[in-house]
Amino acid sequence: MSENRLIYLPLGGAGEIGMNAYVYGYGRAEIERLIVVDLGVTFPDMDGSPGVDLILPDVSWLIERRDRVDAIFITHAHEDHVGALALLWEKLGAPVYARSFTANIARRKMLEKEQPENVVNTVSIWPETVSAGPFDVSFVPISHSIPESSALLIASPAGRIVHSGDFKLDKTPIVGEAFDPCLLYTSDAADDLLC
């Protein structure tokens, strides 16, 4: 008997700075529908990796399941969250969703690598929702050091998760919007928080 399950798989960025790439999946084991949050790079330690310019997350697990990847969501435009998108998109082939500032950066990166820019979709903040397989994803403004940074409210049949992305607690940020915690205290509040 097969049961549906919710999975979370960090491919980079967990326990390290840079190379953010996370997978959420829902469904029966081995046939879950998948979404990706961020596709970033990291920069090498010049003492230990001379001649290496960028390090990408290992997405071989995702490539093997490419037909199950429903969407890629980018939380903000820092290189460690969007820097690998144009380098890896062709291997995954899923539509990309981001807020306006981040989407424009992502489109530019796609053009530079001769990838189709029209796969990058601009979305508005919550309550707008993007449906991707069994997931409904909303972008929630959060303070950070770059415009239009977002946490993601990810709803699945198993519950709701907040994927925070990078953030700083700042009620009056110089760049971007302040986080409104009231957004998480609605009837659609999250069951889990992943930072």
Protein language model features and the residues they cover:
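Single conserved hydrophobic/aromatic residue that forms the stacking wall/gate
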Residues: 185-195
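His/Asp/Glu-rich metal-coordinating catalytic cores
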Residues: 2-73, 78-187
